[in-house]
């Protein structure tokens, strides 16, 4: 495993990129900013390595971009209708960030945090 600098965050901290490679050449790159999968290189049918993941070139892209690209950590997956739910008689309200629904997570939560 290699660890390289992946850029600086707006608050001045440095984000790292961890590159893991298998014995057969498959390569994954994950940043400690949101545990986002930055790239995944696998061989195509002719053995040529291809990156099959949409990712940004540096930490700044993940910090300022949209769409949860590469995000692997979040409070919940998919959409919570009505931006809220009830559990054991207790009503929990979430941020409506997709019309009247809450999509994937609220603003400034797990998927957008540095794991440094």
Briefly describe each language-model feature range.
Residues 4-56, 81-96:
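Beta-strand-rich N-terminal accessory domains
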Residues 7-10, 71-77:
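Short Gly/Pro-enriched turn/cap motifs at secondary-structure boundaries
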Residues 50-52, 71, 78, 114:
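Residue-level marker of intrinsically disordered, low-complexity segments enriched
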Residues 62-70:
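Short, basic/aromatic beta-hairpin or loop at an interaction surface
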Residues 100-104:
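Short, Lys/Arg- and Gly-enriched loop/turn segments at beta-strand edges
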Residues 107-116:
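Single conserved hydrophobic/aromatic residue that forms the stacking wall/gate
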């Amino acid at each position: 495993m290699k660890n390289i600098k992946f850029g600086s965050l707006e608050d001045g901290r440095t984000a790292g990129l961890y590159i893991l490679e298998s014995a057969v050449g498959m390569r994954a790159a994950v940043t400690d900013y949101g545990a986002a999968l930055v790239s995944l290189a696998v061989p195509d049918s002719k053995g040529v390595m291809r990156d099959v993941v949409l990712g940004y070139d540096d930490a700044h892209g993940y910090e300022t971009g949209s769409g949860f690209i590469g995000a692997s950590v979040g409070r919940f997956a998919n959409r919570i209708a009505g931006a809220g739910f009830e559990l054991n008689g207790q009503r929990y309200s979430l941020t409506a960030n997709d019309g009247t629904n809450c999509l994937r997570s609220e603003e400034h939560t797990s998927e957008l945090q540095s794991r440094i």
